[in-house]
Structures are given as structure tokens and as C-alpha cells.
A protein has these predicted regions:
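A conserved regulatory-domain signal marking ACT and ACT-like small-molecule sensing domains
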Residues: 1-81
Length: 81
């Protein structure tokens, strides 16, 4: 088992938005362990949806690469754990 990381991503509430993020994660071989989709929390603005992803990565280096890739793609996210 690799290193686990949980991230919260704020997406535009439109068809295909989650797929775009999942495709980016897949391109770096991140294993998605859990997905929680939330439109109702107070921290989710109108027209957006919050998604919490639990990911398995190979090691710390792989996790750092994944986080940098999301930043480079201007994906609105924060690391929770």
C-alpha cells in the first residue's frame, strides 16, 4: 500500500468537470479510493460542487508530483490530510 492523501476540490457544477480532474489524476497513476460529492455544504458556492477524493499514491515523491500537477493545471483544491 502506498501513501494516502485526501484532497478537497471545488469544481464548476457542469457535466464533465469531475471527469477532467479524474483524467488528470489517472495520467499520474493516482488510485482513487473514495469519492464524496457535495453540493450542499456552506463552503460550496452557488454554481460549484465540492468533491473530496481519497487517493493512494506510491510514495511521498509521487504525492508531491501529483499536488504540483494539480497546481499547474489551476485546479482549485486543498490538501486535507
Amino acid at each position: 500500500m502506498g501513501r494516502m492523501v485526501k484532497i478537497f476540490i471545488l469544481l464548476k457544477d457542469k457535466p464533465g468537470a469531475l471527469k477532467e480532474v479524474v483524467d488528470e489524476l489517472a495520467s499520474l497513476s493516482a488510485n482513487i479510493v473514495e469519492v464524496v460529492h457535495d453540493r450542499l455544504s456552506s463552503n460550496v458556492r452557488a454554481g460549484t460542487t465540492g468533491v473530496t477524493l481519497s487517493l493512494e499514491t506510491e510514495d511521498q515523491k509521487h504525492m508531491d508530483k501529483l499536488i504540483q500537477h494539480l497546481k499547474d493545471k489551476d485546479i482549485d483544491f486543498k490538501v486535507l490530510t
